[in-house]
């Protein structure tokens, strides 16, 4: 009955799950048939893949960045596969450019876990140019108003969306896609 209602009326997953909750309540509490209530499955929303930016779109995005710091921050996020919070929290000491290592240390990433990610030669060159010009001391991307603090996540997101709009990129998604 429920499956027929779903297919006929093209119900949203949340609506379907409300009906499932009502049925589970009815079977479990009203009828006392817990076993039947457990077997009614919930509807799951399909997982959508994010829209990935092409190389040409990435080049336009980096070119549209407001300044060298923002450009290098965006390049680091994309080249190393970092979340915005991770790239903002990078310290100069987290960059290991030794030829036998070439990695970036991510401290307290998703789930509070530390990890290492690859440092490509092209990103290393961009980071060296940035370092020579901006000379960051502790934080790789410090705040402009207070160098003792890391770049603010919301400011990084704003900078990304501004660059995306300036570059004429219409794909949806955030800095992490």
PLM regions: where:
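Conserved catalytic core of the tyrosine transesterase superfamily
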Residues: 1-177
């Amino acid at each position: 009955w429920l499956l027929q209602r779903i297919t006929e009326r093209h119900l949203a997953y949340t609506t379907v799950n409300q009906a499932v909750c009502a049925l589970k309540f009815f079977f479990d509490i009203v009828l006392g048939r817990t076993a039947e209530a457990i077997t009614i499955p919930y509807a799951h929303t399909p997982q959508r893949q994010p829209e990935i930016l092409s190389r040409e779109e990435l080049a336009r995005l980096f070119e549209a960045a407001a300044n060298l710091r923002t450009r290098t921050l965006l390049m680091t996020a994309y080249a190393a596969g970092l979340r915005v919070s991770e790239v903002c929290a990078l310290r100069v000491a987290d960059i290991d450019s030794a030829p036998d290592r070439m990695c970036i240390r991510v401290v307290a990433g998703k789930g509070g876990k530390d990890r290492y990610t690859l440092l490509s030669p092209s990103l290393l060159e961009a980071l060296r140019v940035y370092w020579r010009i901006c000379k960051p001391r502790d934080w790789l991307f410090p705040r402009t108003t207070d160098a003792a603090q890391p770049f603010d996540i919301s400011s990084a997101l704003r900078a990304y969306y501004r660059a995306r709009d300036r570059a004429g990129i219409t794909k949806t998604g955030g800095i992490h896609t």
